[in-house]
């Protein structure tokens, strides 16, 4: 079955304004993301933006663009608007690829779409990778996920989950713990696949209490009973771009030919 990739791209950014149009190896960042998405098995790749500058740049390299409302409270709301405007069937799969990941492996896009097809009971599919460093487990900027034997998410959190009660002392800090053997710790990777019907439901749900306290939008889906399938990524994800330092590192890497542009 076919699936559509939607790439939300906003010009406004607190830390890096105009990020989608930042030049990397002679191309705007959003073009690199589109090229990677087009290497997946997606039947269609669409950029969703509320900014005319991004629209103009995308049309300049031949991308399909849909202009969306500037008033969306979340990226999922923007995604739902695109699915509605495209008149997608309820069972159609929509993969959300972030516009600041110019090195995203196309294989991960396919993996999310395939998992959504394989696990029909899941409303959403996403990915994770194993954590080997306790500092990441205790880092609130690293979102952890716990899931069951079928890969269905129990919970996502910025806290260290699961807590190793008999292994870590009360008040344990990053510098004085190791990861216990026999249990995996997993970092959530922010790529999602949705069924179009779920997007329509999602935008009707109020923010969940857990979502508000953790600032994690996917908790709204769990709170409302939607199943989220989580799979270990087939290959390591590439880093995204959040800051000027991230951008400088990526430019140096790609301009030296250390990564395909």
From Swiss-Prot:
GO terms for cellular component: cytosol. Its EC number is 2.7.7.38. InterPro entries: Cytidylyl_trans, KdsB, Nucleotide-diphossugar_trans. Keywords: Cytoplasm, Lipopolysaccharide biosynthesis, Nucleotidyltransferase, Transferase. The keyword Iron does not apply. Coiled coil: none annotated. One of its GO terms (molecular function) is 3-deoxy-manno-octulosonate cytidylyltransferase activity. Activates KDO (a required 8-carbon sugar) for incorporation into bacterial lipopolysaccharide in Gram-negative bacteria. This is 3-deoxy-manno-octulosonate cytidylyltransferase. It comes from Marinobacter nauticus (strain ATCC 700491 / DSM 11845 / VT8).
């Amino acid at each position: 079955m076919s699936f559509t990739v939607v790439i939300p791209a906003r010009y406004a950014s607190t830390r890096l304004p105009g990020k989608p149009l930042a030049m990397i190896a002679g191309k705007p960042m959003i073009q690199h993301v589109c090229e990677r998405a087009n290497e997946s098995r997606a039947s269609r790749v669409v950029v969703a933006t509320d900014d005319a500058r991004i629209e103009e740049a995308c049309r300049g390299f031949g991308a399909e663009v849909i202009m969306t409302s500037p008033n969306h409270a979340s990226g999922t709301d923007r995604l739902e608007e695109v699915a509605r405007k495209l008149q997608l069937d309820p069972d159609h799969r929509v993969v959300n690829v972030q516009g600041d990941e110019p090195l995203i492996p196309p294989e991960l896009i396919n993996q999310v779409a395939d998992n959504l097809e394989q696990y029909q009971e899941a409303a959403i599919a996403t990915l994770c990778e194993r954590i080997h460093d306790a500092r990441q487990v205790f880092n609130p900027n690293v979102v952890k996920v716990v899931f069951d034997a079928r890969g269905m998410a129990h919970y996502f959190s910025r806290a260290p989950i699961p807590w190793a009660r008999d292994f870590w002392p009360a008040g344990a800090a990053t510098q004085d713990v190791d990861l216990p053997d026999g249990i995996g710790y997993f970092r959530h990777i922010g790529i999602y696949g949705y069924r179009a019907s779920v997007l329509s439901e999602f935008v009707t749900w109020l923010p969940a209490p857990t979502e508000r306290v953790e600032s994690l939008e996917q908790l709204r889906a769990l709170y409302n009973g939607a199943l989220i399938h989580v799979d270990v990524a087939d290959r390591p994800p590439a880093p995204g771009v959040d800051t000027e330092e991230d951008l400088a590192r990526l430019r140096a890497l790609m301009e030296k030919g250390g990564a395909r542009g």
